[in-house]
Amino acid sequence: MTAEEIIQQILSKHPEVSRNQILENLEAEKSKTGGLIADETLLRLIAARYGVEILQDRVYRKLSISHLVPGLNDVTVTGRVVAVYPPRTFEGKKSGKFASLMIADKDAVLRVILWNDKVELIETGELKAGQIVRFSHGYTREDRKDKVELHLGNRSQIEVEPKNIKADEYPLIGKFATKINKITKAHENIHLTGTVKELFPASTFTRSDMSTGTIMRFTLADETGEIPVVVWNEKAEELGKSLKINANLQLVNAKIKENTNGKLEAHVNSYTYVEVSERLDF
């Protein structure tokens, strides 16, 4: 808050006080401190004497997703929501619920975990894909795949569409997609959009520990090319019931691998967000 804004707040609460009186008080304080303290700080002291509370501005240290590391305990980060996963419950010594979502800025994508009461923002539809959201007082952990993720607990705060941000620093969801002809082995995790061109039925297989799994394959195409997609386990069971030829598809956090023939494939697992839509603009 500027010095002028503080003066205006004092005047609005105490119209009997003149601007000159405030400035005289300011000069007196400056002479006492030898000019070593900023005018804004001195004016806050003067305001307090008049019983006027000047709230501190909320200052957020800008932290990009790519700078996050596991083990941080008081993190504030902002991103555009690109995927929202359904809430889940858990049982044990304590029971509760959690939900996860994916956010992104210009540099990277981050998985965010909401715990217990925070999940209500997803259940009520207040928090959804496409929004810019600021997450404050979170903590970072390493997931099972050695990726950093952000957790939001009781003391955390979530601000949907904060006012003091630049929207152009958080591209729209479609801008995160990589064109198929630009995919390389260097893309470990990727966001893709396209149309289903070939679709093969889901099938089961037996693992080395004799447990069973499910696999499904299809071909995804955009205006630049095509790529085979391999879908695993619960995602295969889910898509096997609903996916059709010519369906428009969005994949967030798919994994790129080489098959036995040296060709690139996109792999979809529980970490991948899948959205089927009627129409998709490239």
What are these regions (language model features)?
Residues 1-282:
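Single-stranded nucleic acid-binding proteins centered on OB/S1-type folds
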